[in-house]
């Protein structure tokens, strides 16, 4: 496999977020692009990172499918060293069992990290159906989650047709409520087809919300006592999706 990113911007934003959830990342490359799908160790959250072929300047893989597994901490360490405007190449070296990461900026640098051995079992993405979809300013939902973390350890979402989303944090003595409706600055679009209620871990939501740097818009999909779907799109070439199991408060 040899793929070339036009710059390091997306990698520097996305890799640390993914590394905060999983220790090993399995990247599956096909003619449709590169995809990472993984559950966190507690099996509470799933992360999906999709990169279309259009995200790359050059895109070459061996055969119909190529799978590589790396330590996300190793990848994060290297990505932190990259400059945003540097062109970046990922190249597999099967003889040395390494992933080479080439940075092409003012200085040409070549890093390498081990390819990990293990079962090449692809994690299936669950088939989920939602009737409630809300598009929010990503920095606004991050602010809501950050503020709520001072109140409680879970965040409650209530969807009310046709266009209201209530987000609430309740502690022993403190409480915070946010009501979002169509027409507000933080709301890009809101489509509530059915009433829904669910509660989710703030610790996980805080990790997800760091993706506000990836995209200006966060897409939420909700259903009663059902996994939360939180999606961020980078220039329509990459997608970062989080699926979070509900809490039974």
UniProtKB/Swiss-Prot annotation:
Report the family membership.
Belongs to the PCNA family.
The answer to whether UniProt assigns keyword Membrane to this entry is no
* One GO process term, biological-process aspect: regulation of DNA replication
* Protein name as annotated: DNA polymerase sliding clamp
The source organism is Nanoarchaeum equitans (strain Kin4-M)
Subunit note: Homotrimer. The subunits circularize to form a toroid; DNA passes through its center. Replication factor C (RFC) is required to load the toroid on the DNA.
Q: GO molecular-function annotation terms? A: DNA binding; DNA polymerase processivity factor activity
Top-rank taxon of the source lineage equals Archaea
Q: What does this protein do?
A: Sliding clamp subunit that acts as a moving platform for DNA processing. Responsible for tethering the catalytic subunit of DNA polymerase and other proteins to DNA during high-speed replication.
| Signal peptide start and end residues | none
Q: Does the keyword DNA-binding apply?
A: yes
Concerning InterPro entries, the annotation shows: DNA_clamp_sf (IPR046938), Pr_cel_nuc_antig (IPR000730), Pr_cel_nuc_antig_C (IPR022649), Pr_cel_nuc_antig_N (IPR022648)
Task: Could you list this entry's UniProt keywords, alphabetically sorted.
Answer: DNA replication, DNA-binding
Q: Where are the transmembrane segments?
A: none
Which HAMAP family is this protein grouped with? DNApol_clamp_arch
């Amino acid at each position: 496999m040899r793929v070339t990113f036009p710059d390091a911007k997306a990698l520097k934003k996305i890799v640390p977020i993914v590394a905060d959830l999983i220790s090993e990342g399995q990247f599956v490359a096909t003619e449709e692009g590169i995809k990472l799908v993984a559950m966190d160790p507690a099996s509470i959250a799933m992360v999906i990172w999709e990169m279309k072929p259009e995200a790359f300047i050059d895109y070459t893989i061996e055969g119909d499918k190529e799978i590589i597994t790396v330590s996300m901490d190793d990848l994060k360490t290297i990505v932190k060293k990259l400059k945003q405007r540097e062109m970046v190449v990922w190249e597999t070296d099967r003889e040395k069992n390494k992933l080479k990461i080439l940075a092409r900026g003012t200085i040409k640098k070549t890093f390498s990290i081990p390819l990990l051995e293990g079962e090449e079992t692809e994690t299936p993405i669950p088939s989920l159906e939602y009737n409630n979809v809300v598009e929010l300013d990503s920095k606004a939902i991050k602010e809501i989650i950050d503020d709520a973390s001072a109140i409680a350890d879970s965040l409650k979402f209530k969807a009310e047709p046709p266009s209201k989303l209530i987000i609430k944090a309740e502690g022993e003595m403190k409480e915070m409520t946010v009501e979002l409706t169509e027409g507000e600055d933080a709301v890009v679009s809101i489509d509530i087809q059915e009433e829904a209620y669910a509660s989710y871990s703030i610790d996980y939501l805080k990790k997800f919300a760091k993706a506000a740097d990836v995209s200006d818009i966060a897409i939420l999909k909700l259903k009663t006592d059902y996994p939360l779907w939180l999606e961020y799109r980078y220039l329509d070439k990459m997608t970062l999706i989080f699926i979070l199991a509900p809490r039974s408060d």
